[in-house]
Amino acid sequence: LNCPYVGNVIVGVSDEDEYFDTLEISHNPRVIKGKGGKERSDTVRLNLETVATEYVMVHDAARPLISQDDLKKLAVLTKDDVNGAILACKVSDTLKMVSDEKIIKTVPRENMYRAYTPQMFKTKLLKQALEHADKNHLAITDDASAMEVLGYEGLIVEGDSGNFKLTTPDDLKLAKLMIEKGNN
């Protein structure tokens, strides 16, 4: 919230949630309590109705270590009139295609990236893409995939690998260590 590249923050919260309102951040005038959907893409689609800016950045709470430098990398692209851009990191590990726990083949990694958030798009295009995905019951794992379905090209912006997704207890331990050492 102390970033010059971010305006208001809409937090998608389910109707059943009793925790968000107890957080200090929920009382910040720049934080707007939005609607929660069944799926992540539903939450984003529902809350885009309240966005009046030309561009929107979509982020998720599972990536709390986003840097201001990465936010700036996305924000400056709005001057170039791009459809959208996502933060990502080049894959450095060897990739294996697997079926029934058996290795099928090694997948070339030269053009592979791990998609991160935030992802930034022209608001009207993202609305259109998510409405299309919803109407056609498409499984959307990130906002860029909804844009791809309609043929909108987005840019890859090399992001900080410290902006990893917290999904396991080990991820949480690593994040705590990074915060303690000031690496966020």
Where are these regions (language model features)?
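Conserved alpha/beta core of the MobA/IspD/sugar-nucleotide pyrophosphorylase nucleotidyltransferase superfamily
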Residues: 53, 113-184
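A residue-level structural signature of the nucleotidyltransferase/glycosyltransferase Rossmann-like core
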Residues: 63, 84-86, 104, 118, ...
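Short, well-ordered coil/turn elements that cap or connect secondary structure elements
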Residues: 3-4, 26-28, 79-81, 149-151
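Short, flexible, basic/aromatic active-site loop/helix in glycosyltransferases
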Residues: 96-119
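Conserved beta-loop-beta/alpha segment of the NTase-like Rossmann-fold superfamily
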Residues: 30, 39-100
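Conserved N-terminal catalytic core of the sugar/cofactor nucleotidyltransferase
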Residues: 1-53, 134-136
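Glycine-rich beta-alpha junction loops
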Residues: 15, 90-93, 161, 170
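Residues at the starts of beta-strands that form the adenosine-phosphate
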Residues: 7-9, 83-84, 153
